[in-house]
């Protein structure tokens, strides 16, 4: 009888053991975001938030696609304190729709919009050679959730226009990035996948319609600016080439 009692108590202890960072990590990887959120809330309540931080750091280091879904769900379900305390500040800036700058890792250029407009009123997106401070490089991320996925519309604050990829392609099958006043297509929607480059957090910014990640072209115009394109190919594993830093404006 005593032995049975000990076994039952041991099983009960296991059943009610606090979640581990592996538990949260695995939930996020397989897409069980609800499970990850529930475990995170429990840990935060118990004063064991460092376990959450450990899981978040691993998700970022491994460039896991569902990391933003996890953060968004916490943000949306009255657990913003977890995002503020356990995630890098960039997540809070994007989910909170703060003004930010997007700095390309490879060339250290901030994204801006050109002054000229085409026949549709669209503006070309560039990496600015000499501007990291004006309103032209200020952007906001506007989150939206659909089918358990999180996408963003990316708004240029000065122009009130949303970043998109054009329809036409070049000889490499790549689409040029523009901004337009409307934002009613999947070409205007983006998902973000975190990564580490030289120890710093960057994001792959991937278009929903074409699954192309943003990059800067290799050609330089007379002002030293580079056009923004969607890359036709895999970018995972190359954050130093295709990553973007999110910096407070």
Swiss-Prot record:
Keywords on record: Signal
Signal peptide: 1-17
InterPro entries per UniProt: Lipoprotein_11 (IPR004943), Lipoprotein_11_N (IPR042046), Ricin_B-like_lectins (IPR035992)
GO cellular component, one term: extracellular region
Cross-referenced Pfam families: Lipoprotein_11 (PF03260)
Function: Small vitellogenic protein found in females. It is synthesized in the fat body, secreted into the hemolymph, and taken up by developing oocytes.
Protein name: Microvitellogenin
């Amino acid at each position: 009888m005593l032995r049975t009692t000990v076994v039952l108590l041991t099983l009960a202890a296991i059943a009610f053991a606090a979640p581990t960072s592996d538990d949260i990590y695995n939930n996020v990887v397989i897409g069980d975001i609800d499970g990850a959120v529930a475990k995170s809330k429990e840990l935060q309540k118990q004063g064991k938030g460092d376990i959450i931080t450990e899981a978040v750091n691993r998700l970022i280091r491994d460039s896991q696609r569902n990391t933003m879904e996890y953060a968004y769900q916490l943000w949306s379900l009255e657990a913003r304190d977890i995002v503020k305390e356990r995630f890098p500040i960039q997540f809070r800036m994007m989910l909170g729709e703060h003004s930010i700058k997007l700095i390309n890792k490879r060339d250290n250029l901030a994204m801006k919009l050109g002054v000229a407009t085409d026949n549709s009123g669209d503006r070309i997106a560039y990496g600015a050679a000499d501007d990291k401070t004006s309103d032209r490089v200020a952007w906001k991320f506007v989150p939206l959730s659909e089918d358990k996925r999180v996408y963003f519309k990316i708004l240029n604050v000065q122009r009130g226009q949303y970043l998109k990829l054009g329809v036409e392609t070049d000889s490499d099958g790549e689409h040029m990035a523009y901004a337009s006043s409307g934002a009613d297509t999947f070409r205007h929607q983006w998902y973000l996948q975190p990564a580490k480059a030289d120890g710093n957090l960057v994001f792959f910014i991937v278009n929903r319609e074409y699954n192309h990640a943003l990059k800067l072209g290799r050609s330089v115009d007379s002002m030293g600016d580079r056009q923004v394109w969607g890359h036709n190919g895999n970018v995972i594993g190359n954050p130093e080439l295709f990553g973007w830093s999110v910096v407070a404006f």
